[in-house]
Design a protein with these regions (language model features):
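Bacterial N-terminal signal peptides that target proteins for export
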Residues: 1-8
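A short, N-terminal "cap"/entry segment at the start of jelly-roll beta-barrel domains
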Residues: 4, 15-70
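His/acidic/aromatic-lined binding-pocket segments of jelly-roll/cupin-type domains
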Residues: 66, 73-76, 111-112, 119-120
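Short, conserved beta-strand element in jelly-roll/cupin
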Residues: 69-90, 96-105
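Short, surface-exposed beta-strand-loop junctions and turns on beta-sheet-rich folds
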Residues: 90-92, 136-137
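Conserved metal-binding segment of the jelly-roll/cupin
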Residues: 114-133
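A short hydrophobic beta-strand segment most commonly corresponding to one strand
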Residues: 135-148
């Protein structure tokens, strides 16, 4: 009987070790309306996970051309407008951090006139660029999905 109890205790203990080694389950992120509205006034991150980031972003000037090797960008335009270029070939690209290049121009890209209510998804590896942003700016909800 003592042997059976010892074996049972060993099994229970080993289950604890196995479960302790399992990665934690993903957590649900909830951000209430007050915090979201606060972020529209002062943009910043909403949520981060192992394979995504979500944030509110605001631009008041043109940016640099970007190419992310492992990130898909998803934008929903909340306010304002911008001229946005996708595809084509990046000019003057330099790696600024692992899996990201920044450049100065795009040749042969497609131009989009983004405005309030528009949605655009830019797959990993596609050059993209806020080419023109009026002084009144553009505010957008951004999700970056990271592929392994």
């Amino acid at each position: 009987m003592r042997c059976a109890i010892a074996i049972a205790a060993a099994i229970v203990a080993s289950l604890g070790v196995v479960s302790a080694q399992q990665p934690a389950a993903p957590q649900v992120t909830y951000v209430d309306a007050a915090k979201v509205n606060e972020l529209f006034a002062k943009p910043g991150p909403l949520a981060n996970g192992a394979d995504f980031t979500a944030s509110i972003a605001r631009r008041t000037a043109a940016g640099q051309v970007e190419v992310h090797a492992k990130e898909t960008d998803i934008f929903y335009i909340v306010d304002g407008s911008a001229t946005f270029v996708t595809g084509g070939t990046m000019v003057g690209g330099k790696e600024t951090r692992p899996n990201q290049m920044l450049g100065t121009d795009i040749t042969g890209g497609q131009t989009h006139q983004l405005k309030k209510g528009d949605f655009i998804s830019i797959p990993a590896g596609i050059p993209h660029w806020f080419k023109e942003v009026p002084a009144s700016g553009v505010t957008y909800y951004m999700v970056k999905v990271v592929k392994p």
